[in-house]
């Protein structure tokens, strides 16, 4: 799971939950963008610019669609413990999209112990960030030999910094 989208309502402040519910039930057709939020999804600026120019990329999202996405993230977070197969969880320490608090809660839900890799310079779009080749190599290595350490050492990094307090 790369930067798992598990930002469920249980970890959202009350005002975000309230505004989402109100918007979805009164004006679900209204669209919003991420402009002005000051969030950086990746360090690969060239790729972000290309995505912004791509006519096939959704740049405005209906509030009703966001409500549905949050429903999916609620389900993902609530059922993380149901995963019975080996898992590799990849998270960028600079992820500004999915809060550490949410990822921490997801990891606590797992019944089995997934392998967790923390990429110090990684953002939310780990597979498109500038050091994406490192992440891809780790995934390929894990697929072929789940018991061996990842080549980057990301699974040996201070995971407690991910599991600790929010910054």
Q: Could you describe each region identified by the protein language model?
A:
Residues 85, 99-109:
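Short alpha-helix in the alpha/beta-hydrolase fold that links the catalytic acid
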Residues 59, 94-98, 125:
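Acidic catalytic loop of the alpha/beta-hydrolase fold
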Residues 1-64:
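Alpha/beta-hydrolase-fold enzymes
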Residues 113-167:
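Catalytic active-site module of serine/aspartate enzymes centered on a nucleophile-bearing elbow/loop
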Residues 12, 63, 99-103, 129-133:
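Conserved strand-to-helix beginnings and helix N-cap segments that scaffold or border functional pockets
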Residues 83, 89-91, 95:
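Short beta-strand/loop motif that positions the catalytic acidic residue
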Residues 61-79:
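Active-site nucleophile elbow and catalytic-triad environment of alpha/beta-hydrolase enzymes
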């Amino acid at each position: 799971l790369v930067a798992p989208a598990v930002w469920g309502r249980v970890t959202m402040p009350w005002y975000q939950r309230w505004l989402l519910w109100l918007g979805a039930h009164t004006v679900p057709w209204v669209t919003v963008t991420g402009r002005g939020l000051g969030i950086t999804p990746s360090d690969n600026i060239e790729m972000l610019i290309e995505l912004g120019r791509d006519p096939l990329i959704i740049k405005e999202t209906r509030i009703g669609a966001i409500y549905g996405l949050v429903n999916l993230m609620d389900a993902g977070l609530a059922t993380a413990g149901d995963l019975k197969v080996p898992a590799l969880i990849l998270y960028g320490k600079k992820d500004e999209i999915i809060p550490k608090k949410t990822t921490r809660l997801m990891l606590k839900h797992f019944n089995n112990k997934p392998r967790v890799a923390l990429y110090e310079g990684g953002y939310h779009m780990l597979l498109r960030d500038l050091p994406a080749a490192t992440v891809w190599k780790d995934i390929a290595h894990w697929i072929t030999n789940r018991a061996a350490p990842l080549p980057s050492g990301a699974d040996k990094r201070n995971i407690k910094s991910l599991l600790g307090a929010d910054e």
